[in-house]
Amino acid sequence: MEETQRSAEYIFQGIMYYFRREKVCPRYQFTLKDPVDPALLQRALDAALQAAPYFKVRMVWEKQDAFLEPNPEPCLVYRGSTQPQMPEQTNGYFFAVSCEESTVYFDWFHFLMDGHGVSPFLTRILELYCNLRYGTAFADPPLPSSPAYDIAALVERYPLQLMDETTLQREVVQTCESTMHRARVRLTKQSLVRKGVENGAKPFTALMGLLCIALGEYLGKDAIQYSYSGDTRDAMGVPDASYNCVCSFQDGVALHEGIRLEEFVGPMDAAVRESLTPERKRRKMADQMGWVYKVDQQKAP
């Protein structure tokens, strides 16, 4: 992005996160073998930003329109483990790098980026820090960043159902407050692989099935709904997208007392596999993003 360039093309992909009542701000943290040198970490951050201009942006508003433009403010390394408010306390940046003793913290606002998109950038910061601190030789080429996908073309290819007051009203999942109880369940990767192989299913499906059984027993329910997300970069033709590029699916399973995983994991696994085909993922993206596109089309000039 050039210094004078202003763009709105990446806003759509994460705008639903921007207007949520509660911000989604994930955190990655890494414990190093030695105390972190903040000055070297700052140098690594500065160098990584030069290789990844997508992250060196701020958002500006003009009336009802939001744009991204290059951020001229310094991107600072913060001291301590407290997560700063992004972008209010981070000079307009939508991520933050902090350190305390031997731990490095990476915080990011789930608006311009998702976990898949931000990980190469955060990895680059660590690599450059290791180059400076320990004399390693990690390369520092520009980080690729795919252009925004064409939402208009996506919606045209997968037309949305007519949205009115009736179709927009959905049943709200009822919640209640009660005393929290915690239970720790230890599942190893090997045990999930074994369960999946035994039942001809993905380890992920085996995990979801076991969790559904446990939740059904814990909550005293005979049906459990579950959700999962799939990365859509390859399906959308944007393999190096830094922005949000996931779709979410929901399904459910009927339970009964004493039910075993092998009784239902087959159909569950088939549904998961079918939902993660490129065509299904593109259609789901159109369903998720279509309303954002339609609302934007209706705003006053």
Residues covered by each model-derived region:
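Short, solvent-exposed beta-strand edge segments and adjacent coil->beta transition regions
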Residues: 25-27, 101-103, 180
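A short acidic-Thr-Gly-centered motif at the start of a beta-strand
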Residues: 95-100, 164-166
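Short, well-ordered alpha-helical segments in soluble proteins
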Residues: 125, 129-133, 215, 272, ...
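Acyl activation and transfer enzymes in specialized metabolism, enriched
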Residues: 33-52, 107-123, 184-221
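Non-catalytic, low-complexity flexible loops and terminal extensions
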Residues: 2-11, 112-195
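Acyl-thioester-dependent acyl-group transfer interface
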Residues: 1-63, 73-96, 216-301
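Hydrophobic residues embedded in beta-strands of well-ordered beta-sheets
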Residues: 64-66, 104
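Beta-strand elements within well-structured catalytic alpha/beta cores of enzymes
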Residues: 104-108, 227
